[in-house]
UniProtKB/Swiss-Prot annotation:
InterPro entries: YbaB-like_sf (IPR036894), YbaB/EbfC (IPR004401). This is Nucleoid-associated protein RoseRS_1534. Belongs to the YbaB/EbfC family. Its main location: cytoplasm. It comes from Roseiflexus sp. (strain RS-1).
Length: 100
């Protein structure tokens, strides 16, 4: 492969990477903790919303609510990572990408 072909291939990969990054920013996943807490996050792991079931909001038991929120965030984060790995996987050639 000559240098010009390599450069063209690199530009093409960069363009595809940017397209996928934009797609991830516009794609959401949901993480849940039972039916009590739902966290919506985009493919970049940015939290977009948190929904709480009214019955889980108990001023006498804040710890349970905190645990449920942490669990829902962890679930959404795992799903966002899986989504990113799935979309970026072909470009990475099986390598683990930092931050994903």
């Amino acid at each position: 492969m000559n240098p010009r072909q390599l450069e063209q291939m690199a530009r093409q990969m960069q363009k595809e990477m940017m397209r996928i990054q934009e797609e991830l920013a516009n794609t959401t996943v949901e993480g849940t903790a039972g039916s009590y807490v739902t966290v919506t996050m985009n493919g970049h792991r940015e939290i977009k919303s948190i929904k709480l079931a009214p019955e889980v909001v108990d001023p006498d038991d804040v710890e349970t609510l905190q645990d449920l929120i942490v669990a829902a965030i962890a679930d959404a984060s795992k799903k966002a990572q899986e989504l990113a790995e799935q979309r970026l996987g072909p470009l990475a050639g099986g390598m683990k990408l930092p931050g994903f």
